[in-house]
Amino acid sequence: MLMIPTIAILSGGFSCEREISLMSGKAVKKALDSLSYNAIEIDVDSNIAEKLKKINPGLAFIALHGPYGEDGCIQGLLEILGIKYTHSGVMASAVAINKVMSKHIFRSLNIDTPKGYVISREDVLKNNIKIDYPYVLKPINEGSSIGVYIIFSHEDYLELKDNSSTIMEKMIVEEYIPGIELHTAVLLDEAIGTIEVRPKNKFYDYEAKYTDGFAEHIFPAKIPDNIYKMTLEHALKIHQFLGCKTISRSDFRYNPKNNTLKMLEINTHPGFTELSLVPEIAKLAKGINFNELVKIIIEDSLQHKNIRDLSHVEQYY
């Protein structure tokens, strides 16, 4: 009889995305219960190593987001403890969450990305910004659009300055790309589809991502066929180059006025609630429901023996 391993669902954690992570964890727990897995939810804190040693799970389902969860930290701990885990490994996670590093890699692979640079808090407060309006100011290592500001005018800048406590010591400032918001899902080394998001707010922010009715989703995205194909190619290319595992989501902006596609980032641990984009794309593109998607992730993750294998980079060297 096949032994079903205990699965530890890691959620919560220390980042600004804690609440999102808890939502993801509960959604995964509900799915695993319905699939008859023995699943235990763990709210990650400084005692996580001791908790994991006590439970000794056969697999850790990483439902964490942001720093310590999708940046290679928890992955490194699980490597040391010898526990298999879902999603990408240490290197892919660490590089993907860092928007500066990932943009360098996009360019090295001839994937176009918005122009920008790292800026200090001091320069932001002095309005010493070398990019004209409109521009985007965002954290280097965050997700879920937390701490992202689109500055269309000097009035927007003054409003940002009035809320200066949200400005980090180091951030990225980059050109704003008008047009269409696109998100591409990769599952099991296949780019399965691209969805278009039309937020009711100025952009696809935290509220739009996690509140039903705050954004319109269109699948497949209503863009030219060659651009749609390009989103699939770029998403799969960066997924494979970084050695991402099982699942990822790449984000783009498409400007129909000049027919340009820009890659914004790749997410190795995309949101995993009932409202999240990857589960939606999986359902619409492949007919895979949420429970089935969780099962696919579990089964694929259990098959990986050498999580730290770097052989995927040989073809690019």
Curated annotation (Swiss-Prot):
Q: Name one GO biological process term.
A: peptidoglycan biosynthetic process
Report the co-factor binding details.
Answer: Binds 2 magnesium or manganese ions per subunit.
Q: Where's it mainly located?
A: cytoplasm
Q: Would you indicate the residue range of the signal peptide?
A: none
Per the UniProt entry, the Enzyme Commission number(s) are: 6.3.2.4
Q: Which residues bind Mg(2+) 1?
A: D251, E265
Sequence positions that bind Mg(2+) 2: E265, N267
Q: What class of enzyme is it?
A: ligase
Which GO terms of the cellular component aspect does the record hold? cytoplasm
Report which reactions are catalysed by this protein. Answer: 2 D-alanine + ATP = D-alanyl-D-alanine + ADP + phosphate + H(+)
**Annotated SUPFAM superfamilies:** Glutathione synthetase ATP-binding domain-like (SSF56059), PreATP-grasp domain (SSF52440)
The pathway entry for this protein reads as: Cell wall biogenesis; peptidoglycan biosynthesis
For activity, the cofactor(s) needed are: Mg(2+); Mn(2+)
- What are the UniProt keywords, alphabetically? ATP-binding, Cell shape, Cell wall biogenesis/degradation, Cytoplasm, Ligase, Magnesium, Manganese, Metal-binding, Nucleotide-binding, Peptidoglycan synthesis
Compartment(s) where it occurs, according to its Swiss-Prot or TrEMBL record: Cytoplasm
Question: What GO terms are given for molecular function?
Answer: ATP binding; D-alanine-D-alanine ligase activity; metal ion binding
Record-annotated residues binding ATP? 130-183
Protein task: Cell wall formation.
State the similarity comment.
Belongs to the D-alanine--D-alanine ligase family.
Protein name (database record): D-alanine--D-alanine ligase
Q: Which organism is it from?
A: Wolbachia sp. subsp. Drosophila simulans (strain wRi)
Its gene is: ddl
